[in-house]
């Protein structure tokens, strides 16, 4: 995000609108709650209520008690938590509802594999954000509380189609 928006200038047409005022207020409330509890705005943080836009925003110094880490956001807000060891991260993920998406930032393949083998989530992007959703050749969907089934491309076609089995005995 810092590389993309380092000059602070984002063209208005490149920012997606939040679907309606109710959801805009929900997203703004998640942001305000996090900042009020000590989160730091590392990038972004601009909200425009007149056209319901939110600039891509990264929050650091985020804690598990903040509402932003307890709900699915569905907006360009990226809360970032730090940790002391990998087992701490895995435990954090395991004791909560399965997330719709999991973003892993690491150059260490063994750490990435350890997280993947010990956690469950909808989709995963390694060293990026949202890419698994944007790739139509990959299924997209959640697990348990975050949804069921897979969508996108052929996966969505199959999910919303009924395959009718017919077995005919030959006399």
Model feature map: region roles:
Residues 1-63, 86-87, 91, 126:
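ALDH superfamily catalytic-core signature
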Residues 2, 46, 53-171:
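Conserved C-terminal structural/oligomerization subdomain of aldehyde/semialdehyde dehydrogenase
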């Amino acid at each position: 995000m810092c590389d993309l928006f380092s000059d602070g200038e984002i063209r208005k047409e490149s920012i997606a609108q939040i679907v309606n005022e109710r959801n805009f207020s929900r997203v703004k409330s998640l942001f305000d709650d996090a900042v009020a509890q000590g989160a730091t705005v590392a990038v972004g943080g601009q909200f425009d209520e007149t056209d319901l836009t939110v600039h891509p925003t990264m929050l650091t110094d985020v804690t598990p008690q903040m509402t932003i880490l307890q709900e699915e956001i569905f907006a360009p807000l990226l809360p970032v938590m730090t940790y002391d060891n990998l087992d701490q991260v895995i435990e954090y993920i395991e004791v909560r509802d399965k997330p719709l998406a999991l973003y892993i930032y690491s150059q260490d393949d063994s750490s990435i594999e350890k997280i993947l083998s010990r956690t469950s989530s909808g989709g995963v992007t390694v060293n990026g954000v949202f890419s698994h959703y944007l790739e139509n050749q990959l299924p997209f969907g959640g697990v348990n509380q975050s949804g069921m089934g897979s969508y996108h491309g052929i996966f969505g076609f199959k999910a919303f189609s009924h395959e009718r089995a017919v077995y005919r005995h030959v006399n």
